[in-house]
From Swiss-Prot:
Catalyzes the oxidation of 3-carboxy-2-hydroxy-4-methylpentanoate (3-isopropylmalate) to 3-carboxy-4-methyl-2-oxopentanoate. The product decarboxylates to 4-methyl-2 oxopentanoate. PANTHER family: 3-ISOPROPYLMALATE DEHYDROGENASE. This is 3-isopropylmalate dehydrogenase. NAD(+) binds at G282, S283, A284, P285, D286, I287, A288, G289, K290, D291, I292, A293, N294. Substrate binds at R97, R107, R135, D224. It catalyses: (2R,3S)-3-isopropylmalate + NAD(+) = 4-methyl-2-oxopentanoate + CO2 + NADH. Its EC number is 1.1.1.85. The keyword Coiled coil does not apply. One of its GO terms (biological process) is L-leucine biosynthetic process. It comes from the Bacteria. It is found in: Cytoplasm. The record marks Y142, K192 as: Important for catalysis. It is an enzyme of class 1 (oxidoreductase).
């Protein structure tokens, strides 16, 4: 029997709740398809601050490195906001990405037919949306040096540096074009080349990569226009390629096309090593412990893990289809209750319904 080692990082807020549901579902799926998943839960984010004093302990890093994949729920809580930046949960996430060289963030956004009414946009605008945001994840302004805050005679001055090298742009562009080749063969590169030198390099390198993919249509949009187009005509996009900061913002805009950020999975990948699979949403501490969180983004992240990291494509498709069936049956968590339905369920009940479908 094939066996896989998965590191679980439940993190903070609703993280443990959606992790518990996903763990149980993956156990069912693995048994049904004849493989084994060995899970190891490790502290990360706020939970690691509580246990180890830092958001990303070395023991967690080593466990991640020795895994076939990492399944992360969510991190962050306002109670850690007064800590020095290097000790906050968010810094642990940045360190995870850099330590595993997770340079490629893949965020699919696809409208589930039964949820078209959940979107804040009209049905006709969103019903054909099927796009992927490919975001560079380990460079750009979040990692650039110098950065900091200094005292001046005019008060405090704060600064960050946005930087990219040709190699960094090249490798993320390759990911986007290869992905587009499997889809509708369109890449839209998003930058701010009319203002930023770093974006001019981004555009030049993307064009160079595109020369190797003659069958792929490459277009360019400035980030402000891309944000508008995502709301105005989202179905025009296939693969959106962009940098760290712009991708962070655009992927959250794209997330709301589905009606809830609780629906969207993501994968953060490297060329050689374990990937990290996580929902796009945050830790939602305001609803933690109430059993009302939407576990679907976490479950779809698990499906991405099955497909990409473990090559268990049949199992991944089976899980995705079961999730769609539950939604088609009218079951909704509270974040989706703008749709007319009487079948509101909580996090654990959504997991139980899905488990019944999988048997």
């Amino acid at each position: 029997m094939k066996s896989y080692k998965i590191t679980l990082l439940p993190g903070d807020g609703i993280g443990p709740e959606i992790t518990n549901v996903t763990h149980k579902i993956l156990d069912l799926v693995s048994r049904k398809f004849g493989f084994e998943i060995k899970f190891k839960e490790m502290p990360f984010g706020g939970s690691a601050i509580d246990s180890d004093g830092i958001p990303f302990p070395d023991r967690t890093l080593q466990e991640c490195k020795n895994s076939d994949a990492v399944l992360l729920a969510a991190i962050g809580d306002p109670k850690y906001d007064e800590l020095p930046r290097e000790k906050r949960p968010e810094t642990g996430l940045l360190n995870l990405r850099s330590s595993l060289d997770l340079f490629a963030n893949i965020r699919p956004v696809k409208i589930i037919p039964s949820l078209t009414k959940a979107s804040s946009l009209k049905e006709d605008f969103v019903k054909e949306v099927d796009l992927v945001v490919v975001r560079e994840l380990t460079s750009g302004i979040y990692f650039g040096e110098p950065k900091g805050r200094i005292k001046t005679d005019k008060g405090e001055r704060a600064f960050n540096t946005m930087t990219y090298t040709s190699e960094e742009v090249n490798r993320i562009a390759e990911i986007a074009f290869k992905l587009a080749k499997q889809r509708n063969q369109k890449v839209c590169s998003v930058d701010k080349a009319n203002v930023l030198d770093v974006s001019q390099l981004w555009r030049e390198e993307t064009i160079l990569v595109s020369n190797k993919y003659k069958d792929i249509e490459l277009t360019h949009q400035y980030v402000d226009n891309a944000a508008m187009q995502l709301v105005r005509n989202p179905s025009q996009f296939d693969v959106i390629l962009t940098g760290n900061l712009f991708g962070d913002i655009l992927s959250d805009i794209a997330a709301m096309l589905t009606g809830s950020i609780g629906m969207l999975p993501s994968a953060s990948l490297t060329t050689d090593g374990p990937g990290v699979f996580e929902p796009v949403h945050g830790s939602a501490p305001d609803i933690a412990g109430k059993d009302i969180a939407n576990p679907i983004a976490m479950l779809l992240s698990a499906a991405m893990m099955l497909k990409i990291a473990l090559n268990e494509t049949e199992a991944a498709t089976f899980l995705e289809n079961a999730i769609n069936e539950i939604l088609n049956d009218g079951y909704r968590t509270s974040d989706l209750m703008s749709i007319q339905t009487t079948k509101q369920v909580g996090c654990s009940q959504m997991g139980e319904l899905l488990a019944e479908k999988l048997k």
